[in-house]
Amino acid sequence: MNCNILNLRHLTVLLILCTAFLGGAIPAFAQQGGKKMTGQVIDENKEPMIGVSILIVGTSTGTVTDFDGNYTLNVPKDSKELQFSYVGYETKVITIPVNSNVLNVQMKSDSQVLSDVVIIGYGTQRKSDLTGSVASVGTKDFNKGMVSSPEELVNGKIAGVQIVNGGGSPTSVSTIRIRGGASLNASNDPLIVLDGVPMEVGGSISGGGNFLSLINPNDIESMTVLKDASSTAIYGSRASNGVIIITTKKGSGSDIKVSFQTTNSIATKTKTSDMLNTDKFINIVNQYGTEHQKSLLGNYRTNWNDEIYQTAFGTDNNLSVSGLALPWLPFRVSTGMYYQDGILKTDNTKRFTGNVNLTPSFFHNELRFNIGLKGTYSKNRFADTDAIWAGSTLNPTIPVYSGNDTFGGYNEAIDANGVPVTGALANAVGRLNQYDSTSDVYRFIGSASVDWNVKWVKGLRLHTTGGYDWSKGKGHIYVPKEAVSYYTTGGRDYTYGPQKNYNKLLTIYANYHNDFDAIHSGIDVTVGYDYQFWKYTTPFYAILSADGVQQSTSAATDQRHSLMSYYGRLNYTFMDRYLLTATMRRDGSSRFASDNRWGTFPSVALAWRVSQEHFFEPLRTVMNDVKLRVSYGITGQQDGITNYGYIPVYTPGLDGAQYLFGGNPIYTYRPEAYNPELKWETTKSWNYGIDLAFLENRFTFSADFYTRKTENLLATVPMPAGTNFDKLMLQNVGNVDSKGLELSVTGHIINTKNWSWTASANAAWQKVRIKNLTLTPGAPSPDTEVGPWIDAYQMQVFSTDYAPYSFYLYKQLYDAETGQPIEGLYADLDGDGEITNKDRYHHHSPAPDWILGFSTSLRYKKWTLSTSLRANIGGYIFNGMAMNTGAWETMSYNDYQLNNLNRSFLDTRFTKRQFLSDHYLENASFLKMDNLQLSYDFGRIYKTIGLHASAMVQNVFTVTKYKGVDPETANGVDTSVYPRPRTYSITIGLNF
């Protein structure tokens, strides 16, 4: 496949067409007149309704009612009708009065229709017509507060979606899993689609920290999650791990609106590693230490955590302007500035964003454009996170500073010759202050789409989108040569990057929608073509000491891959109660050889709206909607693997493989292992669901049960020595099975003028098992050790019939009288009289059995109190921090330094670390209150100026039996956690 088919010329042509249409249409529409419609919307009790959607029929132009139920909308001259809609109420379409500018409306409760529109792949669909497992969260239900990245908006809001933040740093990267992920070695990250442009799965950029955080959360209108094969198969080979569709805010058809919001916060540390306090440390050294170790005790009482952590300031400021620039040109322009200090000193990030959305339409909405431009600049300062380990384990009886200028004035472990001791812990404060690592990251995302409703073919719509996602990241690291942390290499002073990423997209599809009343049928057909091209480049750079001496090098890279796709979807509705969805996508990837390049990914789904049957009529006063769903589909996987794994590739040997010729070092090239038989990893899944709505749609309930089987896993497996240039090779090997249950319930419990109360809860159970890890089905599958390393040990394995990353440990034996673990004594599980690797056993996994979420909002007049909570039930974590700092041997690794001990030493009195003891495996179940917010809507404080304010606490509390810092980790092993802060913030918003 030619990776260069799509280039900027596609976008250039598309933008020229947009400009031509705009330019040609301006004269025709510039003279159009119109009028301003105003009014109030009330309910059956004649109370004002907040948030009623009002749309000019035949356009995407509209507005919503304010706190008093009032609205204002600029209506073009040729407009004939307005549509009023609200969840749980009948949608009303009313003719615009000719001789009046006022239109008041009374809404009526609707127990028959669920007309919400949900964004799906390559289009939209009525919620009542969905056959797949789809969940959507909008602006009003997003998590609030200091939100640095889009995924935080929906954490805990959607059943089956687990989001684990990488720690407390403002640049930390979240792990997102939908239904637990479907793979092992390949990517488990979901596909993210931003305004129709698929992002690179698991995308990253040098110096970028969290790549997704380069999108301003304040610009997001909704996030839709596609979970089952019926909804995801339209994305084919990138959909095995689910899809998240992000839609940004667009301009509305009302007066020009200006919105400004500022959030300012302070963040504090919550919990740090459970180490001995100074008094207990002194007592333990005096009790167990040698005379020399006792002599190393000082007279200070240094709390190293207080020295490295700080109260962190943050601010998030956003300004937007939206409305109608011209009668045919809705627009929204926004800018944002975000700054956040980390609670670890020297850690911070700044982000500046700009966003432009233009949505012009012409010829009575027959021709519509959507032009979006998003730009981001991020400036990051990365702290040396090794200071967290040092801050936990350094001797609390010594001072921070030495009193002289040696080694920057920091108190360090030095020998009799004044030389830093090899392997000794460097001063934690010195690590932070002497490590200067900064980065500059730029990102631009542009998209332009044209949507044409073909006038002479009823229901036919032609659509094309061009997208371009470009990013650049570079950074600089400086450490002075006197810094002990880099003493042996003479410090650091070098620049890396710039890495440049390119993502180009061309989408063309046709959609036909029509209702055939004579046969009680409706069809919606989409056929299309996609082409997407990615490129990543990084220049060669040298890693230098502070004096400019080369220490090592990093090779230049130029990576490219592309994906070509053809797809189609049929939605068929019969009698508004029997629903069919069939999808087919055929993908061709440049990551596979020609014989295996193309993959086909179909799906089919059926749904039955039982509540539309005549026999159900007596129940409709209570049960407003009942829908049964079933789907089956196949999705693919080719992300998370190398771009050229199927062809011979040579890699520079660089510093590790040089030869001397004529006294000069010559770099070598070595061949990489390759496999021309690589093919698609495929996932086959079934989904069974039910959707309910009752009591006039005030309560909704959904349940989904799914099974999933992933075959031909893309995995790196051992090879015989001397085979194919390497001992490891990427192959298609093994299967993984999973199943799960998801439950969601939402209730609009109270909705009156003075009071409203909404609540939602979700729960997800999942079970994942590895079924095979060999090329030959039925052959014995060897255990593969995986996960983080502690010293020379890994605690987790891939094993047949067990969950991925299951813990593989020795069974600790305990003293029957004291209940204390007996050092070095484990159960002889195979009964051979010896403790060997065969005595290790599979014991739990990091994955929780249940993931729960709950949120609620209570309003009294203009006051609103809201909160969100999350819980994990089951799942285990290996307390590596307790194990690795909880034995006497860790008290001192040399003759010049003492180290603090974890409080677990008081319970075990271990002399040696027990690396693989299940004593350190702890239940990681927890209950967290993520946020608690109190807000007040002042309404109009001066003519057209609206004011609202809120106060919030994030990371309010955690209830858990886990003894470490945080029970929530992405990999299940706690080696030294950057604690998540507790954040207090105040938000003030102005609208005019």
Regions found by a protein language model. Name each.
Residues 1-363, 367-374, 445, 680, ...:
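Short, small/polar-rich motifs associated with maturation and membrane association
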Residues 46, 69, 405-408, 418, ...:
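Detector for glycine-centered tight turns/loop "hinges" at secondary-structure junctions
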Residues 127-129, 202, 234-236, 254-255, ...:
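Switch/connector loops and helix/strand junctions flanking conserved nucleotide-binding motifs
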Residues 142, 189, 312-315, 351-352, ...:
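Extracellular/periplasmic, surface-exposed regions of secreted and cell-surface proteins
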Residues 151, 155, 728-737, 777-807, ...:
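C-terminal extracellular loops and terminal segments
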Residues 259-299, 644, 748-846, 961:
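Conserved small-residue
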Residues 294-295, 305, 429, 589, ...:
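Extracytoplasmic gating/loop element in the C-terminal half of outer-membrane beta-barrel translocons
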Residues 846-877:
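Glycine-rich, aromatic-lined ligand/substrate-binding cores of catalytic
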